[in-house]
Curated annotation (Swiss-Prot):
Gene Ontology CC terms: nucleus
Pfam families referenced in this protein's UniProt entry, alphabetically: MAT1-1-2
GO terms under biological process: single fertilization
Gene expressing this chain: SMR1
Protein name: Sporulation minus regulator 1
Alphabetically ordered keywords of this record: Activator, DNA-binding, Fertilization, Nucleus, Transcription, Transcription regulation
Main location per the UniProt record: nucleus
Length: 356
């Protein structure tokens, strides 16, 4: 058994001892978590008719609160033990990273679930005729978007249905307008009615009794800025200082002037010539060279620069013999005669001089 296997066995023994010590708290945590989900399912599945008729579904908020208290108590006990164990043995997550991760994930889920239940509870009264809108009458969900009925529409007339076969889109805009959600990509449980209230910011839910908030998106107010009148007297002073420093900069600084395309090309050619001045030491006749080996280099990458920072011979040959440079800085008569092999397909050559 190597040191890795021994470390895994040690961690497994520590996690087993930790879960044995926290057996009661873990069981209470799991039981409370399941009861919260079960009770929340009753709330989320409840419609307006169920809310009115208590004989269909019985909802008890006190039961849910007791489950939440048990969940929080067991959560604090587990996290407190792991934190104390972490400080004692100096191990990450108190020696049981899996348990700490599961507790954290369950806590986040319960918090989001309770937030959804709060919106759902507030929304239980809103489908009424006096406090808000009724879903599927002046609020419709189609194609991933919520559509609101325009305030000037008469509810007694026949309204167009939102479906894939309705072709007159312009007519729909006379009746409905889209609602911009605060979190378009947020996934919420329940039907579109729950998604509608779950995606609202908290400020809009608190004042949701105001029907105008649902009818229109108010235009943001104009930005008002108060500028003191004395700044009009300071503008010439600032302009004068700016012009003075600008003149000093133009007189004493060496700023590069913009180059034309032709001048930039000439400068590039001169730089290349200076870099190759010490490389070319005369031409070698092709008859005095003998190829030792030949290898196809189609698949071999050829870098532009060597490790010393110098350009490779192939790149130098390509630059010197570039048609763009002929007639400008390197006349055609001054271009060195290059072996014909270098002008064919890429190949690697090794040469030796017969005279030596």
């Amino acid at each position: 058994m190597d040191h890795r296997d021994l470390s895994q066995v040690t961690l497994l023994m520590e996690s087993t001892l930790i879960r044995t010590a926290l057996r009661t708290d873990i069981q209470q945590f799991e039981k409370s978590f399941e009861q919260i989900i079960e009770q929340a399912g009753v709330f989320l599945a409840t419609t307006e008719e169920h809310f009115i008729s208590l004989s269909l579904v019985v909802m008890d908020e006190d039961v849910l609160i007791r489950h939440l208290c048990g969940f929080l108590a067991s959560k604090l006990a587990i996290e407190g033990f792991l934190s104390f164990h972490q400080q004692t043995i100096q191990r990450t997550s108190g020696g049981d990273a899996s348990l700490a991760k599961q507790v954290k994930a369950a806590t986040v889920f319960v918090l989001e679930l309770i937030q959804t239940l709060i919106y759902h509870k507030e929304a239980a009264d809103y489908p009424g005729k006096h406090l808000g809108m009724m879903y599927d009458r002046d609020v419709k969900y189609f194609g991933g978007t919520l559509f609101h009925l325009n305030p000037q529409v008469n509810l007694d007339e026949e309204l167009p249905e939102l479906d894939d076969y309705y072709e007159d889109v312009d007519e729909l805009t006379n009746y409905y307008h889209g609602e911009k959600l605060s979190h378009p990509l947020r996934q919420l449980p329940g039907n579109p009615w729950h998604k509608f209230f779950g995606n609202f910011p908290e400020t809009r839910v608190e004042h949701a009794a105001d029907t105008a908030l649902f009818r229109e998106n108010p235009r943001p107010g104009d930005l008002t800025v108060s500028i003191p009148g004395t700044i009009l007297f300071l503008i010439p002073e600032f302009r004068q200082e700016h012009e003075k420093f600008r003149q000093l900069m133009l007189e004493h600084s060496q700023l590069p002037l913009p180059l034309l395309l032709e001048e930039a090309r000439k400068e590039r050619v001169q730089v290349i010539q200076r870099r190759l001045a010490n490389v070319h030491h005369g031409n070698v006749e092709y008859d005095s060279l003998e190829p030792l080996c030949r290898e196809n280099t189609d698949m071999i990458p050829r870098p532009e620069y060597t490790l010393e920072g110098n350009r490779t011979f192939g790149m130098q040959n390509l630059t010197v013999n570039s048609p763009d440079l002929i007639g400008d800085a390197l006349p055609e008569g001054r271009i060195a005669n290059v072996a014909s092999q270098l002008e064919g397909f890429p190949a690697r050559f090794l040469f030796t001089n017969k005279n030596k």
